[in-house]
Design a protein with these regions (language model features):
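A short secondary-structure junction signal
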Residues: 91-94, 138-140
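Acidic, Ser/Thr-rich intrinsically disordered and amphipathic helical segments
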Residues: 5-8, 12, 30, 34-35, ...
């Protein structure tokens, strides 16, 4: 795909994205491919670094994001990416190669010899969910990830011997589901995340969902809260300072608390941490009323393990890509089911 030929459609996509008109921005396969070529590489590098950092932190604090030790090498890692697309697929493919060297593809010479592939379970079971149909793009990415690059017929023997795919075909299971996330039923959510610990991501997605509907997004997060297994992690990467207008902002005093926008952290804390958890004032109130309010407070089943208002994924200046690469700035939130 010639990057120069994409500039016209990229301008159109960018205009629609800035207006939050996602259906128009990504309404055709051509637009989705162009979006993947232009914006996904920078995002994928940022996403992979965030998850890798979370993995390292988990090892230090003795909890697991995605099992990576030699003893756990036979376990299948599980990731569910809500609002995901090509960037998530790129990020997790790179992360899998980093965490599991055994997931690497075989050299082209071995494949040419016709040796039978070893039967093994998948290292990573990944599900991507979005309202746009990313399946054709993801299928192409998966094929490119698990197939050795094409070499010239004049390539040297050493070049052929060292030519291998990023991943072996059996190492990654990538499934795409096309859903309106906020319309997913409880059964669909359960069937998607399963009953074992998994990493659930919302990369540059949750702020958009909350801006569409606070009640519907809150209800969806409660569905996740109800079904995610102990040890699961919800990881959010979003725009720095991403906020959601208060429903009462239009009628409230501009200087009042009611008029202030909600932050993602505040909205998620209320769902997952049961906040606000301030002590109930008892003065002038009956003991029974106070006891009932205390009893009705939600049980806290999550711990907040990451809260970074600003993070920058700074790229090496020597890194080159035919399209364009940028340093990505974002905020990170992560919650662990306990």
């Amino acid at each position: 795909m010639d990057f120069e030929e994409l500039k016209g459609v990229l301008r159109e996509i960018n205009e629609k994205v800035l207006q939050r008109e996602w259906a128009e921005a990504l309404g055709t396969e051509e637009k989705r491919e162009a979006f993947a070529v232009r914006w996904s590489p920078s995002r994928a590098l940022a996403y992979a670094n965030v998850v890798a950092e979370l993995c390292r932190r988990g090892e230090e604090e003795e909890w697991s994001v995605l099992p990576s030790s030699d003893e756990e090498a036979q376990k299948t890692m599980k990731a569910v990416c809500f609002g995901g697309n090509a960037a998530e697929a790129m990020a997790f493919a790179a992360l899998l190669r980093y965490l599991r060297p055994s997931a690497a593809g075989k050299p082209q010479t071995e494949l040419d010899e016709g040796s039978l592939p070893e039967k093994s379970q998948s290292h990573l079971d990944m599900t991507v969910i979005d309202s746009a149909d990313w399946k054709p793009v993801l299928d192409k990415l998966l094929s490119a990830t698990t197939t050795p690059p094409l070499l010239s017929k004049y390539a040297s023997a050493s070049a052929r011997a060292s030519n291998h795919a990023l991943l072996s075909p059996s190492s990654l299971t990538l499934t795409f589901q096309q859903h309106d996330i906020l319309a997913m039923t409880a059964k669909q959510v359960i069937d998607t995340v399963g009953n074992k610990p998994c990493l659930t991501t919302f990369f540059l997605t949750l702020g958009n969902l909350y801006n569409l509907s606070i009640p519907k997004t809150t209800a969806f997060m409660y569905k996740l809260d109800a079904v995610l297994a102990v040890g699961s992690i919800i990881l959010i990467i979003d725009v720095i300072g991403s906020s959601v207008p208060s429903p009462s902002a239009a009628t409230a005093d501009p200087e009042s608390e009611e008029a202030k926008p909600y932050t993602l952290s505040w909205l998620l804390d209320r769902v997952l941490l049961g906040k606000p958890a301030e002590k109930v004032p008892t003065q002038g109130r009956g003991k029974k009323v106070v006891e009932e309010e205390e009893a009705n407070k939600p049980v806290v089943r999550w711990e907040k393990i990451v809260a970074e208002d600003m993070k920058i994924n700074k790229l090496d200046e020597k890194l080159r890509y035919p399209g364009s690469l940028e340093n990505v700035k974002f905020q990170v939130l992560a919650y662990r089911r306990v």
